[in-house]
Amino acid sequence: MSEQAARRTRALSCWRGPVEPRPLGGGISNHNFLVEDGERFFVRIGEDFPVHNVLRRFELAASRAAHAAGIAPEVVHAEPGAMVFRYVEGRTLAPEDLRTETMLERVVPLVRTAHEAIPRHFRGPAPIFWVFQVLRDYAARLAAVGHRLAAGLPRYMAAAERLERMVGPIDIVFGHNDLLAANLIDDGRRLWLVDWEYGGFNSPLFDLGGLASNNELSPALEDRLLELYFETPVTDDLRRRYQAMKCASLLREAMWSMVSEIHLTIEFDYQAYTAENLDRFERAYATLANP
């Protein structure tokens, strides 16, 4: 598949001459390439993934809106199944980079800008990403195919229902919804937020919970994260609702991987990723007080 994606990259109509794509690591659901054609470009090859509620037309619209908001690189070309971005020269962050107050003080304003500014630039129909509906859809898909972990689905969905009640009423922002460290690039002067395939309207708590869970922030840093975002001391109610959404984020990552075991063909150990995230979900869920 990677060679097929490379051939597709070479054939894109935007190039001024022959190009030789260089594979870039990091993608676990797409093929990514660096292309030099007078300047450097980042190429992302990926089809719609209905099983993950990923539609590339929404990703393209979100990517363009994120660029207009000043937080993501420019989309210079798009064809069905392919997007070409201006390449950002910089360092992709690692989870340990996020585990400092200094970095959180840089990341949180970027996330808040995404939440508040992208709706002003998004054009066309816009998606909503409600993690609990995603979990319901994943559970139905996994049960239908008799996934190897299907016996645990009723318990996971009971947990999801409890978490949804704990989250309660929400504010609506435009979320990134996949805040892995690998989606943040530091060019030495500023941060960029990339990879908008899951972008959609959501609660800000999901991005905050995902940022914490994906990068294993300490409890003290989690409180600091909430203080920076909401610009107010953290209340017990906010902390409780945030922790519930964080648990939902971990369960979604685990069930995303369970579905990916069946449907994705990228060379990646999805079963190990499933096990890792289920373990993290179980540990986080066990710490929640009864509602």
Name these PLM-found stretches:
Residues V111-F122, V167, N215, P233, ...:
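A general structural signal marking secondary-structure boundaries and capping sites
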Residues S2-E20, E116-N177, D187, E227, ...:
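An alpha-helical support segment within catalytic cores of ATP-dependent transferases
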Residues R240, A244-C247:
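Start-of-helix signal in alpha-solenoid helical-repeat scaffolds, especially tetratricopeptide repeats
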Residues L205-V234, C247-T265, R280:
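Active-site activation/catalytic loop segments of kinase-like enzymes and analogous catalytic loops
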Residues R141-A151, M255-P291:
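ATP/Mg2+ or Mg2+-diphosphate-binding catalytic cores
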Residues R22-G38, F42-V43, E161-F206:
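Active-site acidic catalytic loop and adjacent metal/ATP-binding pocket
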